Amino acid sequence: MRVGLDIGSTTIKCVVLDEQDTLLYSTYERHYSHILEKAQELLRRIDAEQLHGQKALLSISGSAGMGLADSCGVPFVQEVFSTRVAVKRFVPATDCVIELGGEDAKILFLTNGTEVRMNGSCAGGTGAFIDQMATLLKMSADEMNKAAEQAQRTYTIASRCGVFAKSDVQPLINQGARTEDIAASIYKAVVNQTIAGLAQGRPIKGNILYLGGPLTFSTVLRKSFDEALGVTGTCPENSLLYVALGAALYADKSFVLTDVADALDKYAATATYASEPPLFANKQEYEEFHARHMSHSVPHVPFSAHCGPVHIGIDSGSTTVKLVVVDEKSQILYTNYQPNLGNPLPLIREQLLKIYKEHPGLQVASVTTTGYGEELVKNAFRCDYGLVETVAHFTAAKYFMPDVDFIIDIGGQDMKCFKIEDGAISNIFLNEACSSGCGSFLQTFAQALGYDVKKFAALGLFADRPVDLGSRCTVFMNSSVKQAQKDGASIENISAGLSISVVKNALYKVIRASSPEELGRKIVVQGGTFYNEAVLRAFEKEMGVEVIRPDIAGLMGAYGAALYGLRQSSKAHRTASGMMSRQELEAFEQKVVSVKCGGCGNHCQLTVNTFADGRKYISGNRCDKPVTGKSADNSLNLYAYKQELLASYKPVPGKRGSIGIPLCLGFYELLPFWWAFWTKLGFAVHTSPVSSRGLYLAGQATIPSDTACFPAKLSHGHIKALSQMELDAIFYPCLTYNVDEGLGDNHYNCPVVAYYPEVLAGNCPELEGKKFIYDYVGIHRPKDFVHKMAKNVLPKYFGGISEKEVQEAAAAAYAEYEAHMAKIRVKGSEIIDEARRQGKRIIVLAGRPYHVDPEVNHGIDRLITRHGAAVVTEDSISNRVQKFPTSVLNQWTYHSRLYAAAKYCTTQKDMDLVQLVSFGCGVDAITTDETREILQAGGKLYTQLKIDEITNLGAVNIRLRSLFAALDERDEVAEEKAAAKAEA
């Protein structure tokens, strides 16, 4: 008989085959990271039930199986090879295998060149990701599949990583989107991730086989793959067991299974692991620490004994709802903290009704909302004030430490840190890319190891040798934890190591501090994660300073909101809130529908909440048209003006034919140049359509790497669109250099902008048989440009074009480009002047020319103008400063403008810069730090917005509102100081 054991990242699968390869026995069980014990139990069980002490051929496979196989002398077979062996034996006609496991994803091409594609550093789109999303929706994976079957539409969700997906899913939940639609969207995201991230341009066709847990258990996931690939794939019998089946077929060495189990028993970790010093030297040190933190508390007063006005603060967070009631002295009368269960409104209504019922005649003076669901809650219950969460947390922190200079708030999946200077927020950090420093990070590990998170955290307090896990992402940390277990680390030392790692991630990955000292010495920590005393202690040790952790650390947003309401109603001499009465709350109803807006080209996916009294709250809109019925006023928006300019370049009929230009990357600046050049030569210039989600998905199958920035990925869709048009040629040259504006040490294009045509030529099958002009060209030297185009480039593709014609076309191109850039600068000046006349703030929304693409910027420019500010671009003001020294090599044209714009901002009181960064941009790893340095040296706030295919602007809105609130606070502090000085 043959036995195959597949030890995966989350499960163990085992099969027993007879001599004819008939399956006699199989099992599929989760191991909860207790790999050794589970393997021993299985081996002994199979021996007792199937083999009765007889020898059997045995081999081990799976991502977690190699160490065990080595330790007991059993042959190990690599899982991809194992899968191939089983597929060839049981489903020989298969062309391609798609296998999704707990933390790994694979595509195995078996025909036209055997090849395997596997996920590397990210577990997005795997079983663990689907489990995470199901947990977020408060469902089992099976329930999520059933819900998805009832979907009416889908949303755009990132599946690259659980954190990014949460940043898409959570706002949808908070805005009231249907759970069924979200569930279907998650499966669609997994499909997109697998196709774009793994296939990387290789077509998936022929007979497709689906393997692994997610594809076995989810009918909707299989259907989504079928729809995306245009095939009907097969999920075979025993699809969960193919790696184990392959291991059994490969086995050629016999063992008594109980002997193998005993050998594992004797296996003791010989490796030693790197460790950190213990969190506490002894019990006494812990007790002193505990007592110190318990002393930082807000006075609590019995609600029943209170008479007089009250102020309510509601924090509708990413995963929880917090409510605090205070009196006129800021004392707490009542608190409530509970999970939001995917829909915060019924829970908040229940709490408000409870307060009304238990305290009849209560005088509510103000109700203030904050958090992710702030607007929804405020509109639903007619609350008085909405407060951006950063300001709510700052307001609460000042209660405990009026001269606080650094606040860190670590919640379930988000992290907020702010530096305070002169009584106002001077810098804000939010985690955009990773939740490894957050509470859900610890919770995920506690659950994986089979513990409640509170018990798991407490285990680490007195660990003698905490494991040094470094600061890494959740997926990498998983393998580190498993390795530590193999090396003999106790659960206590792993728990302590994870708590230390949370702190290191927060400080060195999110905040990117070079040293703890630069952050501040008067620190308030808040957020539910700091109730974990191991994390709190690790933070103090890493910072080298004692911090204040309030007794209401998890309620600080709600408490700050209540204090804000108290202050505002006192200023306005308001004694009665406009919130719903008890009767209105009892009659409260919420209906949610999802619609696609047809008001403009954005086609926003709107979530419309309708309440019992007929009021509506619309979310998901990037402009005010769905709410007001009027088109957005773009008169103070230079992004909108640039879009209009580019749209004005229409094809002019030409005698020589037609040229197609993809409206992507560098063409967002150079379209006027090339339009004029080709038009003058007698070609009709056609551009690809404006970017859209559909255009991106159309080109997705040819994207060769998921690490490319989103604007580069979009270019595949543009090429596909052009290939379907009747054109004589498609033109997309490689441009090493850009125009020299004299601002930097050199004037390169970034490698992606410069050479991406090479990638397209090698990966887009639709270009086969097409005339694709992607020669290397230089426009930075006009004379050389004319010579090269006339002698080397054009003759290869078109006959009969003279050098004189090329010279005239080049002159027209340079003139058109200069006129285009001059228009942008003139319009920028007009917007600045008009904004100053109206007393508006001016935001330099700085990035690259292609960030003007609405599909890339997701309407962030319009979001800023909705907040009452004017928007200009970096290239409209970069000519206002002379070249100046920078800390980095200043060699990229686009970035030279960025630095110059930042420098100019520091000289203008009413101007601030927001930097757009495309996720995955290598050059921006340098530019962001340099831009921050320039702005901070000039006393300005630095705000960075990371953007990619994610379209939900919830986190972006919080960031922008935080910036505006911080600027307002600064102005207030400055006015107060000036008034005090005048009085003195």
Would you name each region that the model predicts?
Residues 34-35, 112-153, 240-243, 249-253, ...:
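Glycine-rich phosphate-binding loop plus the immediately following alpha-helix
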Residues 4-45, 115-116, 120, 314-354, ...:
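Short glycine-rich, Thr/Ser-proximal phosphate-binding strand/loop in the N-terminal lobe
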Residues 64, 198-228, 239-243, 370-373, ...:
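Glycine-rich phosphate-binding loops at beta-strand->alpha-helix junctions
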Residues 182-206, 247, 291-300, 497-520:
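Phosphate/ATP-binding catalytic cores across multiple sugar-kinase/actin-like superfamilies
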Residues 119, 123-130, 434-442, 449, ...:
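An N-terminal assembly and electron-transfer interface module characteristic of large anaerobic redox
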Residues 1-20, 94-111, 302-333, 404-420, ...:
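Gly/Thr-rich phosphate-binding beta-strand-loop-beta motif of the actin/hexokinase/Hsp70
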Residues 76-80, 226-245, 384-391, 540-559, ...:
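Conserved phosphate-binding/catalytic loops in two-lobed NTP-binding clefts
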Residues 127-132, 237-271, 395, 439-444, ...:
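Glycine-rich phosphate-binding/hydrolytic loop that grips phosphoryl groups
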